[in-house]
Amino acid sequence: MNFDVNSKLKLLFGYINFSGDGMKFLANLTRNSVIWMCMLGCIGLQSAENSGVSDSSEWPTYRGNTSGTGYSPLEQITLDNVNNLEVAWTYSLRNDSSQSAREPNSQATPVVIDGVMFLPTADRVVALDPLTGEELWSHSVPENAPSRRGVTYWPGQGGISPRIFYTAFDQLIALDAETGDLDLEFGESGKVSMGIPYISVPFVYKNIIVVGANTPRGAIGGIGNARAFDAINGSKLWEFESVPSPGNPGNETWEGDSWEGRLGANAWPFYFTVDESKDQLYIPLASPIPFAYGGDRAGTNLYANSIVAVDIHSGEYHWHFQTIHHDLWDHDPPAPPTLFDVNYNGKTTPALGVTTKSGYLFVLDRENGEPIYGVSETAVPQSNVPGEETSPTQPIPINPKPMARVSFTTSEIVTAQDTSEEHAEACRNLVRSVGSITNDGPYTPWTYRSDDSNNETTLLFPGLSGGPNWGGIAHNPNNGYVYVFAANIGTLGWMEDAEPGSPLPYALTGPDGRPSGFSVRINGKTMPCQKPPWGQLTAVDTNSGEIAWQIPLGITEEFPSNRQATGRPGRAGALVTASNLLFIGATDDNRFRALNATTGDIVWEYQMERRGNANPMTFLGSDNKQYLLITATDKLMSYSLP
């Protein structure tokens, strides 16, 4: 941020007179803390004057870089000393001094820039001293809560101070990074209306801010186009039409006027990625809404369920790759592509990897969107819902093999030998209660129950919550591996005639009046009813397209000790470091783990109070110590070596 001396002194000692929009600065410091902070400040000033810590030692974006790799070149924490990690500090994401009823359920990954950490809490955006977790400033968000997923940093330009950008419902908001005050020079008094809600992290590249869209289920009107704004003044730069209007390529994939007013096909990911050598932005687009019935939208429905490459300066279309045609399962790409190079068949190719909730990892040439290891347009089961026109084929990667379970047979129902008699009996009761279970492999459509005499139930794998999810892919440039965490949770459901007056003739439902998980609850915990693993971490060698290793991740303590390694569900992703360590939380057993990134062996774990449902990050502090951080629901956890 290149703070000047006065700015650093303000951050060190606090303001005597509190002012600004919801600002609170630390004051009344003890003599010792003043001395300590002064020493820290002097170090910071000296570092700034001598170019300071290199960019690679910090964590400037949600995934560490604009390629989204989740990789850090730091190697102070190693396979040999990782077992010595201890908690350095914690920071509560609750606002104990306010009357706010907002409860934190944070999925945030902080950013660290020029020795300052920034992140959202339940009802604030805060700047912290990354060595201690002490607040430097706190900005209250009085209306809509800030995105629980993160904030982004813009370094400023031409006399304009650095800014922190965050979203709150449909507002894009700029703060002065040095003070936390609203930056009134941006937009209308520091705010810009995005035109649609977006509850994730704005993506900053040069002087461009890219945001996506969250179109609520059942909403009427409002389109999920990605948009770009000028980081200097907030003016709108471009908008990419994710459901093409007449005259634009792709409109022919929507029969008749089914494109018009169509919801979904929105860019909802937590972040974006860009190829800086080409200024090419990659936009992952979601399923059409409604997703379960597509009889009113015959066709492949571009650009839903696609990765679209555009010019980040203009939004001009370059290419696309559709991962599902005519989606009926809500199995969109939940995270943007991760960018890396592949050495395959004697050729180095600039590539990207993108997962889908359907359990697959697609590796594409990022210059043209062509699959590197091949994709097969595979015949898939067809729907019996009246009026539905299922796509006859779906694109399935030849390599790598699936990251999650994609099929099921009744022989795979869990037994007492797999877990426990109590669990197995509960699952047998569930199976008896739902009637006849159908799964015909990948992309099994929802079966239609025309009347009460039909008791057929579709069991979808992965279920509606998906296999891989928003955590995205981590890439290790040292061995060419990418790492994907996925859950194995099935969904039970069927289509039936909709209630009179409904906008569509058929509706998706299930055993409890809605689609439900193929699982039971024991002692308050979800226990899937198919054989484990229920959560798994996969390493893929991108230089061959083959799976290098795949392990269950997470334990179920309710089972006998020799049956606890079931894997547990989760949605977050991993962090990889140059010391060949992989760090991941994600699982609902509340563990934070380190693994050998080459072998998949677990080498360290820490039992947290709450779930680490967020992507971890790491940075090198001004004390030359490597810190490791993860958000655990309502608390930020920081670890370091002694």
Predicted segments, located by residue:
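Short, Lys/Arg-enriched N-terminal segments with co-localized hydrophobic residues
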Residues: L12-G22
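Bacterial Sec-dependent signal peptides at the C-terminal "C-region" and cleavage site
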Residues: G41-S54
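Extracytoplasmic/lumenal domain signature
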Residues: N81-R94, V125-A145, G158, Q171-I196, ...
